[in-house]
């Protein structure tokens, strides 16, 4: 839908910048997990969720 409004030059620029945007998005997500309570976020990941169960 967005490509309908963009010209061919900008379509090519967007295609070139998509991997960079994904990389920075991944870095931002890892930074968010690092800066916040990592356990709160990683409790939603299925494999890691079972690793840190407390035996009460």
Swiss-Prot record:
For the Mitochondrial matrix compartment, the record's topological domain ranges are 1-12
Name the residues that span the membrane.
13-35
According to its record, how does it sit in the membrane?
Single-pass membrane protein
The record, for InterPro entries, names:
Single_a-helix_sf, UQCR
Subcellular localization(s) per the UniProt record? Mitochondrion inner membrane
Q: What is its main location?
A: mitochondrion
Q: Which residues form a coiled coil?
A: none
Concerning Pfam families, the annotation shows: UCR_6-4kD
GO MF terms on file? electron transfer activity
Alphabetic keyword roster: Electron transport, Membrane, Mitochondrion, Mitochondrion inner membrane, Respiratory chain, Transmembrane, Transmembrane helix, Transport
Spell out the family assignment given in the record's similarity comment. Answer: Belongs to the UQCR11/QCR10 family.
Please describe the quaternary structure of this protein.
Component of the ubiquinol-cytochrome c oxidoreductase (cytochrome b-c1 complex, complex III, CIII), a multisubunit enzyme composed of 11 subunits. The complex is composed of 3 respiratory subunits cytochrome b, cytochrome c1 and Rieske protein UQCRFS1, 2 core protein subunits UQCRC1/QCR1 and UQCRC2/QCR2, and 6 low-molecular weight protein subunits UQCRH/QCR6, UQCRB/QCR7, UQCRQ/QCR8, UQCR10/QCR9, UQCR11/QCR10 and subunit 9, the cleavage product of Rieske protein UQCRFS1.
Q: Which PANTHER family match?
A: CYTOCHROME B-C1 COMPLEX SUBUNIT 10, UBIQUINOL-CYTOCHROME C REDUCTASE COMPLEX 6.4 KD PROTEIN
Q: What does this protein do?
A: Component of the ubiquinol-cytochrome c oxidoreductase, a multisubunit transmembrane complex that is part of the mitochondrial electron transport chain which drives oxidative phosphorylation.
Q: What is this protein called?
A: Cytochrome b-c1 complex subunit 10
Say which species the protein is native to. Answer: Homo sapiens (Human)
Q: Gene encoding this polypeptide?
A: UQCR11
């Amino acid at each position: 839908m967005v490509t309908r409004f963009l010209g061919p030059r900008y379509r090519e620029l967007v295609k070139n910048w998509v991997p960079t945007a994904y990389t920075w998005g991944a870095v931002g997500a890892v930074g968010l997990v690092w800066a916040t309570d990592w356990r709160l976020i990683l409790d939603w990941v299925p494999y890691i969720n079972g690793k840190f169960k407390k035996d009460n």
